[in-house]
Regions:
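Contiguous beta-strand/loop segments that form the cofactor/metal-binding neighborhood of enzyme cores
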Residues: 182, 188-254, 284-295, 331-334
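Predominantly a Rossmann-like dinucleotide-binding segment in NAD(P)-dependent oxidoreductases
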Residues: 125-202, 321
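C-terminal helix-rich "cap/oligomerization" subdomain common to oxidoreductases
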Residues: 1, 60, 68-70, 289-334
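Basic phosphate/pyrophosphate-binding loop/patch that engages nucleotide-derived ligands
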Residues: 110-118, 132-148, 222, 242
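Beta-loop-alpha module in the N-terminal Rossmann-like domain of NAD(P)-dependent dehydrogenases
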Residues: 49-111
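Active-site loop of classical SDR/Rossmann-like NAD(P)-dependent oxidoreductases
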Residues: 14, 273-285
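N-terminal Rossmann-like dinucleotide-binding module
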Residues: 1-49
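Hydrophobic residues in well-ordered beta-strands that form the structural core
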Residues: 15, 94, 119-121, 227, ...
Length: 334
């Protein structure tokens, strides 16, 4: 199969302005269709982004014309959408977070194992230039053994918004999903990827609706990490302290950017050269290759489930006031 024909599920501004163009540009990828519950909305969006087909549901997708779906839907719809697509043999890329519970992540993984189709999670900061460079430096042990780190992924929400006020309604997506599921999952995924798995967490602060969260993470390696994710401030920092130096970034996350990374050793600081990149282009090129069977997906389903497990542990810790272990999700996929 020379190119994976993707259907974009969702018609948000983010889906149409960022993901659709990236699907069209990515190597080994083509944008074949748009899916929305409103068929006329799907048709209008398809015309806007240059897709030939429009469908009102995943079940309506013509399997002769589409190989996989990219789910850019509300968090609460991720599980049902992924399982429906996998049951039809469609490859799935699901936006982060993978789901709102580990239990549903496990159901998604089971569906993928049964179908044989790819299930991957859109943890796009895997391809952020500062993270790519930091990973290479850490793999070479340039700063020695890591013993502590801190990371922030936050933004200042608009005044009057649910995010800014930090008051969750009684039901719906916003009641279940807050800053940790929004930007915090990027930080959790980055720590898991760069420094190894999180073993134990202690929630220092989680406000109502999870609008302002701070947690201490103890890694399996013994390193300690302070993580913050808020809707009350702009935060974009990463610091990794090792026995032989420090890596620092004042811009590690973004969409189309070069970012910043520097290394401090023996009292001298050197900036690491970075090239501007669109994280979605790189992500969708890689995952199209993975769907074609040319490689394993870097942002695997299991990786997505592990990140949700860390968030669940933070929530348990916030409720109990005590440290909480991170439970490994079931399933072998990824």
């Amino acid at each position: 199969m020379s190119s994976i024909r993707w259907a974009l599920v969702g018609t948000s501004d983010f889906a149409l302005e960022w993901i659709a163009p990236a699907l069209a540009r990515a190597k080994g990828s083509s944008l074949a269709a748009v899916v929305s519950r409103d068929r006329s909305r799907a048709a209008a969006a398809a015309a806007q982004v240059g897709a030939a087909e429009a469908y009102a549901s995943i079940e309506a997708i013509d399997r002769d014309l589409v190989d996989g779906v990219v789910l850019v839907t509300p968090n609460s719809a991720h599980g049902a959408g992924a399982i429906a697509a996998l049951q039809r043999g469609l490859h799935v890329i699901v936006e982060k977070p993978m789901s709102h519970t580990v239990a549903e992540c496990e159901q998604m993984i089971a569906a993928a194992e049964t179908s044989g189709a790819m299930l991957a999670v859109a943890h796009c900061m895997e391809w952020a230039p500062p993270i790519v460079a930091a990973r290479e430096l850490l793999e070479r042990s340039v700063i020695g053994r890591v013993h502590r780190a801190r990371i922030g992924a936050s933004f200042l929400a608009e005044p009057g918004s649910l995010r800014r006020d930090g008051v969750a309604p009684a039901s719906g997506d916003a009641a279940r999903f807050g800053a940790l599921f929004d930007m915090g999952v990027h930080a959790i995924d980055t720590i898991n990827r760069l420094l190894g798995p999180v073993a134990i967490v202690r929630s220092v602060r989680t406000d109502t609706g999870d609008a302002d969260a701070v947690a201490e993470l103890q890694l399996a390696s013994g390193a300690a990490v302070e993580l913050s994710s808020r809707w009350s401030a702009d935060e974009n920092f990463l610091e990794i302290v090792g026995t032989n130096g420090v890596l620092r970034s004042r811009e590690w996350w973004g969409r189309e950017f070069a970012g910043h990374l520097e290394i401090e050793q023996s009292g001298a600081t050197e900036q690491v050269p970075l090239r501007r990149a669109n994280v979605y282009d790189a992500q969708l090129s890689h995952l199209s290759d993975a769907a074609s069977g040319r490689c394993a997906p870097a942002t695997s389903a299991r990786r997505g489930a592990v990140n949700v497990a860390v968030i669940e542990a933070v929530v348990r810790s916030a409720r109990s006031g005590e440290s909480a272990p991170v439970s490994a999700p079931r399933g072998r996929l990824g």
